Amino acid sequence: MFRGVKTTPRGSTTKVYLETREATAGLVVAYDGKPLTPEQRLAEQARLERFVKNPEELRKKRAQEHEDAERTLRIVRALPDAFLFENAGDEIGSAGIGRAGEPLLKLKFRPNPSYQPPSHVEEVLTGMQGYVLLDAVRLRLASIDGTLFRQVGFGWGILGHLDRGGHFIVHQQEVKDDLWEISRMSLSFTGKILMLKNLSIQSTEDFSGFKQVSSELTFAQALELLKKEESAKTVELPAGNPAQR
């Protein structure tokens, strides 16, 4: 179980997440740092309860999560072949990045000109440069910071493109011995889909409050735990940008 605060130009949304053997349950508990109204709370619980009442909806959710995880894994697996790396010294791990106080190896990366992406998923790597921070002792990726230095097409340019200047950051931290979790994900991209529809992704999500729970919970059991978690704690977050909802 963990908490995520996602911030976009429209404001912030706080969720409590719980991963189950069926799918990940995420319950909204605050907008712009303010707890939900009774009406919003009932609507949010009803949104999740539809997965409990409709097995087909839950199956689709699980399939989408699996597809997203596979896409991410393909990108990670491609990194050693897609990039050329150069030693850029060391940094010290801090809160949210690696293990606090422990050294991290910094490597700059740029595209490998001989790399041929096997699918449109990996195409974005051909126009990206940046750096990674590695825990060389535990063989863990603590951070990756990448920027598109040129426009990059995906689907070989047929499906669309991402504009030059797109930027992303992912931080990982050790939350307990040999257990690492993503602590921050920041995305800033613009482009076009099918050369017609504008694409704009601007978001930062911070994750905290990691607690270990049973991995054998059902989605229905997770929903009940999330309701209790929401009731037991008062959300105390800096107010985000006002948003119309």
Q: Where would I find each of the regions flagged by the language model?
A:
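Beta-strand elements of repeat-based all-beta scaffolds
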Residues: H171, I182-R184
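Structured extracytoplasmic
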Residues: M1-Q129, V137-A142, T147-G166, E174-K176, ...
